[in-house]
Amino acid sequence: LLGVVVGVVAFFIVSLSMERIESPHFSAQLSAARLMASSIAELSTFRESLGIEIDPSVDPNLTGLIGPEFTELTTTLGNLQAKRTSTNPDFAALLVKYFEELDLKKGDPVAIGASGSFPALLLATLCACEVLELEPLVIYSVGASEHGATHPEFTFVTMLERLVDVGLLKDSLIAVSLGGNYDTASGMFFPGARELMTEIALSSGKTFIYEEPLQAS
């Protein structure tokens, strides 16, 4: 009993002596996290309005950012737990911290190359850029690992278009490639996958990147 009392007293003393130190980037980090949360809420609602069901057994927080396991867009294996973790809006706050540590200033360009494997992390990056008034330049590849942006009617191209339409983000997409092996969607699981991915890339209206040598791509 004496040990318990001593432990409680020690904890109380430590609690009183604790000092809350606010991050120097707290305001921007909070804004970025809130923007990402608002974006996720918008995309979740939009996805359901398109008639694309959100499976709560796969996406328990109903973010809409976690796709099916296997579709024509699936390129590789993926970790479902990692996909769920990536939907935390705190990642936008973390990206603010990283950008501030790089001493990026308003108007600085940020080159972003991303596949559909982790749409939430791409969203986090764009939210951080939006808050810090940076200029993101995104090259996106349509292919995605399992449970990424694997639904053909709900790739990140569609997600970003929606967020731009409702005024949450600016259009930062400058080019689209297929992704997959050699960035040419070779060796896909489903027949006709490359054709579908090409259609998605072309329909984006952005520069389409397709080169046989990977270095050229």
Q: Each predicted region: which residue ranges?
A:
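Ser/Thr/Pro/Gly-rich low-complexity linker/stalk segments immediately outside membranes or between
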Residues: M18-A32
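Hydrophobic membrane-insertion alpha-helices, especially the h-region
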Residues: L1-L16
